[in-house]
Regions:
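Active-site-proximal or metal-binding-adjacent scaffold patches in catalytic folds
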Residues: 1-56, 65-95
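Walker B catalytic acidic pair
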Residues: 61
Length: 95
């Protein structure tokens, strides 16, 4: 499921560098991106959540491959690829 969602979403991005995907259980994060190492890690627990949450985390982390910080440009890119990200982000704080 992770790979199919990732493949569907990454085509929305231009100039996305090649990167490695890692899935593992994390206790405090839904995802993490190491831009320098070109590695995206997703929390394996996302498999139990609605796909909108998985999609948001993927978009968020892929956006970090382009913008390392949470700048205005970063959030614009997230919104471009996940229109309702603000609501999804709010809902995820309840988990």
């Amino acid at each position: 499921m992770f790979n199919s969602r990732l493949e569907r979403l990454k085509i929305q991005f231009e100039n996305l560098p090649n990167f490695r995907l890692r899935i593992r259980k994390m206790s405090t994060r839904w995802g993490v991106c190491n831009k320098k190492l070109k590695k995206v890690t997703l929390n394996s627990e996302l498999i139990y959540k609605d796909t909108k949450y998985l999609d948001y985390v993927i978009v968020h982390e892929l956006s970090h491959l382009i913008h390392a910080n949470h700048s205005k440009s970063f959030w614009s890119l997230v919104e471009e690829n996940c229109r309702d990200y603000k609501q999804i982000k709010k809902e995820m704080k309840e988990f």
